């Protein structure tokens, strides 16, 4: 792995400052994968999102409606974390598949085994009135093949728009991956929001989370065009191929790989009911508790040649620019 000095990770898509065309040989690479990596990705993103709402005074007293939540193993960690902080939240977890039994028997968690449609969304809104709703969506349709088709994605995004329109949440975190330009069908609309990047996503995933806080006005929509799709493809490939394969040498942490650096900046925003001498100590505590919960082994930085002594400095981003080749990014998890 190559080394780099960075002040901070790319937290949102708009911050990515370079692009790269796809190199076909990347499809043959053997991807590194942690146990329960998908649950880790979701847990970190949702902990960051909900902690942001907590900081803004939005979370306490809300009902989290999570559509597409199964198996939901990681949700037990989220529930326990905020419960132990004294934050009052109710959880409604909805999926056509069954949830992890670890979520059974909790008074503040309602499990619903069914898929949603417009009629059911209206019944949820009526049932929860006048509670404030926080919406999390991880809906995913695959009518064939290993990844959703563009038609699947457009159907999912239309459903997510209906969720927002009917449930009228105070905030939402939606699944978002732009269709690939070589599979383009038509322009479409998504809610306006911040496009949060995800540490520990699969190696060439182009998926992110669309985060929005609503302040009473009607939902704002953003049009997505084929030109946007080209931009998403190139920037996400640059992030995955170049940035995420770096070791951040000025990052004083047991594992200096970029995804851990990204995780560090997400976890530093999280509240704890303990005090710590340093931010690093808090984040080590949180990481260890998360990894222990998900049965993920703790690892150190690997394959760094001639590593200099760690130093707490900020330096310029030394990543190279303007690489070129051609093909679509593939990876949507």
UniProtKB/Swiss-Prot annotation:
Task: Please name the top-level EC class of this enzyme.
Answer: transferase
Functionally, this protein is described as follows:
Displays methyltransferase, positive regulation of the poly(A) polymerase and transcription elongation activities. Involved in the modification of both mRNA ends and in intermediate and late gene positive transcription elongation. At the mRNAs 5' end, methylates the ribose 2' OH group of the first transcribed nucleotide, thereby producing a 2'-O-methylpurine cap. At the 3' end, functions as a processivity factor which stimulates the activity of the viral poly(A) polymerase OPG063 that creates mRNA's poly(A) tail.
Q: Which residues cross the membrane?
A: none
Q: What is the lineage of its organism?
A: Viruses, Varidnaviria, Bamfordvirae, Nucleocytoviricota, Pokkesviricetes
InterPro entries named in the record:
mRNA_MeTrfase-like, Pox/kineto_cap_MeTfrase, Poxvir_cap_MeTfrase, SAM-dependent_MTases_sf
GO BP of this protein:
7-methylguanosine mRNA capping; methylation; regulation of mRNA 3'-end processing
What ranges does the record list as Basic residues composition bias? 323-333
Report the protein name in the record. Cap-specific mRNA (nucleoside-2'-O-)-methyltransferase
Which species does this protein come from?
Monkeypox virus
Any one GO cellular component localisation term in the record: virion component
Q: Name one Pfam family in it.
A: PARP_regulatory
Q: Which domain of life is it from?
A: Viruses
Q: Region Binding to NPH-I: start and end of each range? A: 169-249
Subcellular location as annotated: Virion
Q: Which family does it belong to?
A: Belongs to the class I-like SAM-binding methyltransferase superfamily. Poxvirus/kinetoplastid 2'-O-MTase family.
Q: Name one GO molecular function term.
A: mRNA (nucleoside-2'-O-)-methyltransferase activity
Cite the active-site annotation: 175 (for methyltransferase activity)
Q: Is Repeat among the key words of this record?
A: no
This protein's encoding gene? OPG102
- Please state the Enzyme Commission number of this protein: 2.1.1.57
């Amino acid at each position: 792995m190559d080394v780099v000095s960075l002040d901070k990770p790319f937290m949102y898509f708009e911050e990515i400052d370079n692009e790269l065309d796809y190199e076909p040989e990347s499809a043959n690479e053997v991807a590194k994968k942690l146990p329960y990596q998908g649950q880790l990705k979701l847990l970190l993103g949702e902990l960051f999102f909900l902690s942001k709402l907590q900081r803004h005074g939005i979370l306490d007293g809300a009902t989290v409606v999570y559509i597409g939540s199964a198996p939901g193993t990681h949700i037990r960690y989220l529930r326990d974390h905020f419960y132990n902080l004294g934050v009052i939240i109710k959880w409604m977890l909805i999926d056509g598949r069954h949830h992890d039994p670890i979520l059974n028997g909790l008074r503040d968690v309602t499990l619903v085994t069914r898929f949603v449609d417009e009629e059911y969304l209206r019944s949820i809104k009526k049932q929860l009135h006048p509670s404030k709703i926080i919406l999390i969506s991880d809906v995913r349709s695959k009518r064939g093949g290993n990844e959703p088709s563009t038609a699947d994605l457009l159907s999912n995004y239309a459903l997510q728009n209906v969720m927002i329109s009917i449930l009228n949440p105070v905030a939402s975190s939606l699944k978002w991956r732009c269709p690939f330009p070589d599979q383009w069908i038509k322009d479409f609309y998504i809610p306006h929001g911040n496009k949060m990047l995800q540490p520990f996503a699969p190696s060439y995933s182009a998926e992110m989370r669309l985060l929005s806080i609503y302040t009473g006005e009607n939902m704002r929509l953003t049009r997505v065009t084929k030109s946007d799709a080209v931009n998403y493809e190139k920037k996400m490939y640059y992030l995955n191929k170049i940035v995420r394969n770096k070791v951040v040498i000025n990052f004083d942490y047991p594992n200096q790989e970029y995804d851990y650096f990204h995780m560090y900046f997400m976890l530093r925003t999280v509240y704890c009911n303990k005090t710590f001498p340093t931010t690093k100590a808090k984040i080590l505590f949180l990481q260890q508790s998360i990894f222990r919960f998900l049965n993920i082994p703790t690892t150190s930085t690997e394959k760094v040649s001639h590593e200099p002594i760690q130093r707490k400095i900020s330096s310029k981003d030394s990543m190279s620019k303007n690489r070129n080749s051609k093909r679509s990014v593939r990876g949507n998890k």
